[in-house]
Every structure is written in C-alpha cells, then in structure tokens.
Amino acid sequence: YRYDLAPYTWKLVQNLQQGRALFTQPPMPIKCAGAPQKAMYLSCDHWLKSGRLAQINTQFYNAGGVLFGVADYVPALMKYVERYAIDLKFSHRLVAVDGPGKRATFIRTQADGSSETVEQSFEMLHVVPPQIAPDFIRSSPLADAAGWVDVDPATLKHRQFANVHGLGDVTNPSNAKTAAAARKQAPVVANNVLVALGRRDGAAVYDGYGSCPLTVEKGRIVLAEFTYGGKVAPSFPRWLLEGRQPTRLAWWLKARVLPALYWHGMLKGREWLAKPQKADTRHG
C-alpha cells in the first residue's frame, strides 16, 4: 500500500466528467475482499450527487464468480449496483494495462473452463493488484504450497512446528484478511503461546471472525460480519444495527469509533472485548 494513492484516486474521481471507469478485483485471497467495491461505490456516489453518473459507464471486473463471498449481504449490495447502473463482469482477471493507450487486458474464464482474452478501453482505471506473502515467508519452511504460513485454523498453531504460531494476512486459514480478524486472532495467539510455555492452561480458538464495512455511499455502510463458512456473526442486536442493510450508525462506527479502538485499544492490548474463546473438547 502507498499512502499517496488514496488522494490520487480521489483526484481522478473528481476530475472524470464522462467515459468508462473500470474497477478491478483480483483472485482471492486479498486484503479485505470488499475493498475494491468500496472505492467503486463511493466513486459512483460522488458522480451521482454531482450529476455526472449518467455520462459515466462504470464496470466492475471481478476475477471471482460472485459479488461478495457471504450471500446474506449480496441483496443490499445489488441495490447499489442497480442504483449506480454498474456493469458486473465476473470471472475476469486483469493481466495487463496499457497506461498511455488507456487499455486494460483481462482473461475471462468460461463456464466450461476455457478462457479468452478481453480488451477494454477506459478513461479511469482503479486496480487492486493480486496479493502474495512476502518472499521471506514464501521461501521458508513455514509456508504451505501456496506460500502462506501453514497454521491450524482454530488454534493458529503451526501444523509442523509446535513452537510457532501465526496470525494476520500471511497465514493460510480461510478467514477474511481484515484488521477485525487480526483483532480476534491476537489474543488467541497470545493465550496459546502461554499454554505452549506452560504458563497457562486451556487453549483458545479463533472462529474465523472477520468484518468488512462496505461503504456503499457517503454516510451509509453495510457492516458485514461473519465467521468461517460465511456464517453471519453480528456484534450488535438487529434492533440496534442490522448489518445486512446500509445504515448511518455503521458509518459512524467506522468513521468515529473504530479509529480510536484501533490506535488506543487494539494496538496497545487494552481491548477487553476481544477476550479469546477457550477451546472445547472438539479442539482437544
């Protein structure tokens, strides 16, 4: 990530008057699977409110086959896809960009497994690159065949080296790679390291929790929260915050509460709400 690219993207969005805007999403896993859509929805919201959306053809090229991996949140997102008249292109993987010529090249995977090359011109292109683990991890004995640290998805203990535990984006469990996941993983690893050192009894387990605040328009967020297997796992009662619908409360949480929680709670180990869950007999 480069800190200068967010304001650069915002400048492109503000300056685009008409034409074709392409937004891309690479194959999983990536950091926050909803991030490519967040930029797209906020851009479209700006164009809509500035009276330019009708002159801009927005296309979303997704290497995957679905809009979002947890089906419960798709209906709310589809309403915004329709509102912004976004053209969804599934199974399209970006492979090349001709910047000066303003052309993007994709590999489209067909239903029968065959593929074809697709080229598209653009006035604006928002690229989310494919993501891999750092070389020092990929080339180490800690990595699995795909290059990620190979840990048990529940205990986060390395499958081969009993004195190694892992957390965060570099590990191979199927959870969403988000700060919300790391927030839940860190206390589990801390507990289980103490167990391995003989200083605490009772292993803790991670349930795959992840969260993705999908910014569908300025002032409203669809707050996706889920565990392993795409099971919806809300932190708030539905009468207070219905995560499957866009709400202003979720925006307020993202804009006002989460930054303070991150800097003064998560990073300093002071957040009691992330207390680890102890393993039951199924985990030994």
Question: Predicted regions: what is each one?
Answer:
Residues Y1-Q17, S121-K184, V195:
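FAD-site-proximal beta/loop scaffold in flavoenzymes
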Residues Y1-R52, P153-A154:
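Glycine-rich dinucleotide-binding loop and its adjacent helix/turn
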Residues L22, N57-Q59, H165:
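A structural signal for isolated positions on well-ordered beta-strands in alpha/beta enzyme cores
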Residues P27-A71, P276, T281-H283:
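Beta1-alpha1 glycine-rich phosphate/pyrophosphate-binding loop at the start
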Residues L48-A146:
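A Rossmann-like FAD-binding core segment of flavoenzymes
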Residues G147-H165, V216-F236:
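FAD-binding beta-loop-beta segment adjacent to the flavin cofactor pocket
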Residues L167-V216, L223-E225:
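A conserved FAD-binding loop/helix module that cradles the flavin
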Residues L223-G284:
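C-terminal auxiliary extensions adjacent to catalytic cores
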